[in-house]
From Swiss-Prot:
<feature type="glycosylation site" description="N-linked (GlcNAc...) asparagine">
    <location>
        <position position="359"/>
    </location>
</feature>
<dbReference type="InterPro" id="IPR001046">
    <property type="entry name" value="NRAMP_fam"/>
</dbReference>
<dbReference type="GO" id="GO:0055070">
    <property type="term" value="P:copper ion homeostasis"/>
</dbReference>
<dbReference type="Pfam" id="PF01566">
    <property type="entry name" value="Nramp"/>
</dbReference>
<feature type="transmembrane region" description="Helical">
    <location>
        <begin position="520"/>
        <end position="540"/>
    </location>
</feature>
<dbReference type="GO" id="GO:0034755">
    <property type="term" value="P:iron ion transmembrane transport"/>
</dbReference>
<dbReference type="GO" id="GO:0005375">
    <property type="term" value="F:copper ion transmembrane transporter activity"/>
</dbReference>
<dbReference type="GO" id="GO:0016020">
    <property type="term" value="C:membrane"/>
</dbReference>
<dbReference type="GO" id="GO:0034761">
    <property type="term" value="P:positive regulation of iron ion transmembrane transport"/>
</dbReference>
<dbReference type="GO" id="GO:0010008">
    <property type="term" value="C:endosome membrane"/>
</dbReference>
<feature type="transmembrane region" description="Helical">
    <location>
        <begin position="105"/>
        <end position="125"/>
    </location>
</feature>
<feature type="glycosylation site" description="N-linked (GlcNAc...) asparagine">
    <location>
        <position position="574"/>
    </location>
</feature>
<feature type="transmembrane region" description="Helical">
    <location>
        <begin position="424"/>
        <end position="444"/>
    </location>
</feature>
<keyword id="KW-0325">Glycoprotein</keyword>
<feature type="transmembrane region" description="Helical">
    <location>
        <begin position="373"/>
        <end position="393"/>
    </location>
</feature>
<feature type="glycosylation site" description="N-linked (GlcNAc...) asparagine">
    <location>
        <position position="41"/>
    </location>
</feature>
<feature type="transmembrane region" description="Helical">
    <location>
        <begin position="77"/>
        <end position="97"/>
    </location>
</feature>
Length: 596
């Protein structure tokens, strides 16, 4: 029996650990076969397939310090360090950097507290995703494969793929703009878009050199971003008192609708749907003995500390960007920036980019390219090139983690494993074709303004990651003793409602700004109805996961919502992934050579 059978959808009639054993003789043997098939289908010890992303060749061993009776071990923390920092890169992609710029230019430091609390909310959601992977040994997409019917599972996969491709387009745009700046416009935007194809495949082969070396590379890219944007923060020297006030005073006096929209955009940019799928899979790279409750608790503890540190670093980097452009661009018009650039080499570029209206009162609409020009005019060419290096690091690191997220999504939802190069070729081509056309035939403004549309698209996908995460981590049959408590459930649901509501508001405003009419408006309305209905379906499933007996006993819910023909399901509370301790490497007696 191949190791890939651990991914097959369970067949009918399998008995859980608490189920009946059947008759003696042949019935008993068949019962044992079915019980073993359940273990193969739902084991926490998944033998990595040859093409599985990220951790196919090795797992990081966790040092055993139990004999020394050490309460907190930095050796163990170091062993668990890696997945959280890879996850945090999604908080630092070019779309986030541009959102930081725009919020600083529009509201100065007034909505820094929104960035802070959005990061905290993101941490709480990432904690749930990581716990799911640690406790069950299955990541979020693999769990969706087991817990949803075929049609909703496919819809979920399509939605997450849209989010991944949207994020990939932002990364392509950011990388192309960075190359354009660093090459002093020698490499055109469309050339930078094409270069992203080549460099992505180059990076894909780096994980062949070892898991820890790959994680070190990601850490290096984060360090480059911290140094680059930290340099800009130091040379711009914003008022530290105002920065602290903006962080810790949750208020925004004299803020107009544009500032409110920027605040909503910050939340939408920070909390990325595909990142929950990514993080739940990355934690599987550590060798954790799930048969021991103590080891699982320990892993949850150290992963949470690591994620907290990683997101703290990402928050500081985002803070640097907001503060730099809040200090330099807030309240200024395009003409003000052009005046600053008057005696600089980038004066002509500034005149073409910072175009003012007739009255000379147009407020700056910040984007990645304009940010580089502004820094170059204000602090010299070195500042512009350092900005370009930071954006390049953001684009490259996000590209790689996006590739892994796509690989995990495809492996989990479809039980399909493609080689990484094939997966990247398909995703990257889908992202590059529209981006290349814009870069080839449109202006820089069209390329950068696409980020707003992409942020709106990704905001729509958030429920398709948040609701399954809360549902599975709140299900006792899945999480065992690690299930969310009542307080955790209430807080998670309330926070998710707030975040999803904020994101939907952002989407509605963006759609209104597009002034959609006629047949296209009718299509948008139909999509909105289907979108609401599917979210309602996911909420019903979540309520059943949380133990709502009325829903679980409903024939309609049993037929259309709950997993069927699955010995492990939310209907079988005696069977938990956390307590299965059988390796799929061993074939039990009576099953050798049998195709289960």
């Amino acid at each position: 029996m191949s190791s890939n059978e651990a991914y097959h959808e369970p067949g009918a009639g399998g008995d859980g650990p608490g189920g009946s054993s059947g008759a003696s003789g042949g019935g008993s043997q068949r019962s044992n076969q079915l019980h073993h098939q359940q273990i193969l289908n739902e084991t926490t010890y998944l033998k990595p397939a040859a093409k599985q992303a990220y951790f196919s060749d090795e797992k990081v061993l966790i040092p055993d310090d139990d004999s020394t009776n050490v309460g907190f071990s930095f050796r163990k923390l170091w062993a668990f360090t890696g997945p959280g920092f890879l996850m945090s890169i999604a908080y630092l992609d070019p779309g986030n950097i541009e959102s930081d710029m725009q919020s600083g230019a529009a509201a100065k430091y007034k909505i820094l507290w929104v960035l802070l609390w959005a990061t905290v909310l993101g941490l709480l959601m990432q904690r749930l995703a990581a716990r799911l992977g640690v406790v069950t040994g299955l990541h979020l997409a693999e769990m969706c494969y087991r817990q949803y019917k075929r049609l909703p599972r496919w819809i979920l996969w399509i939605m997450i793929e849209i989010a991944i491709i949207g994020s990939d387009m932002q990364e392509v745009i950011g990388t192309a703009i960075a190359i354009y700046l660093l090459s002093n416009k020698v490499v055109p935007l469309w050339g930078g878009v094409l270069i992203t194809i080549v460099d992505t495949f180059t990076f894909l082969f780096l994980d062949k050199y070892g898991l820890r070396k790959l994680e070190f590379l990601f850490g290096t890219l984060i360090t480059i971003m911290a140094v680059s944007f930290g340099y800009e923060y130091i040379v711009s020297a914003p008022n530290q008192g105002e920065v602290l006030e903006g962080m810790f005073v949750p208020w925004c006096s004299n803020c107009n609708s544009n500032v409110l929209l920027q605040a909503v955009g910050v939340v939408g940019a920070v909390i990325m749907p595909h990142n929950l799928y990514l993080h739940s899979a990355l934690v599987k790279s550590r060798d954790i003995d799930r048969r021991q409750t103590k080891k699982v608790s320990e892993a949850n503890f150290y992963f949470f500390i690591e994620a907290s540190v990683a997101l703290f670093v990402s928050f500081i980097i985002n803070l640097f960007v907001v503060a730099v452009f809040a200090h330099g661009m807030y309240g200024k018009t395009n003409n003000d920036v052009v005046e600053v650039c008057k005696d600089k080499s980038m004066y002509e570029d500034a005149k073409m980019s910072f175009v003012d209206n007739v009255n000379g009162t147009a407020i700056i609409d910040a984007d990645l390219y304009k940010g580089g020009l502004f820094l170059g005019c204000t602090f010299g060419a070195v500042a512009m090139y350092i900005w370009g290096v930071g954006i390049l690091a953001a684009g490259q690191s996000s590209t790689m983690t996006g590739t892994y997220a796509g690989q995990f999504s495809m492996e989990g939802f479809l039980n399909l494993q493609w080689p990484r190069w094939c997966r990247v070729l398909v995703t990257r081509c889908i992202a590059i074709i529209p981006t290349f056309c814009l870069a080839m035939f449109s202006k820089m403004e069209d390329l950068t303004s696409m980020n707003d549309i992409l942020n709106a698209v990704m905001s729509l996908q958030l429920p398709f990651a948040a609701i399954p995460t809360i549902a599975f981590t709140s299900c006792a049959a899945i999480m065992g003793e690690f299930v969310n408590g009542l307080g955790n459930k209430i807080v998670s649901i309330l926070l998710t409602i707030v975040v999803i509501g904020v994101n939907l508001y952002f989407v509605v405003v963006q759609v209104e700004n597009m002034e959609i009419k006629g047949g296209l408006l009718a299509l948008v309305c139909i999509f909105a109805i289907l979108y609401i209905l599917f979210n309602l379906y996911l909420v019903i499933h979540m309520a059943a996961c949380m133990g709502n007996q009325r829903l679980m006993n409903s024939r309609w819910v049993q037929r259309f919502v709950l997993p069927s023909q699955n010995s492990f399901s939310i209907k079988n509370a005696n069977s938990t992934y956390a307590r299965i301790a059988t390796s799929s490497d061993q074939e039990p007696e009576g099953l050798a050579g049998e195709d289960a």
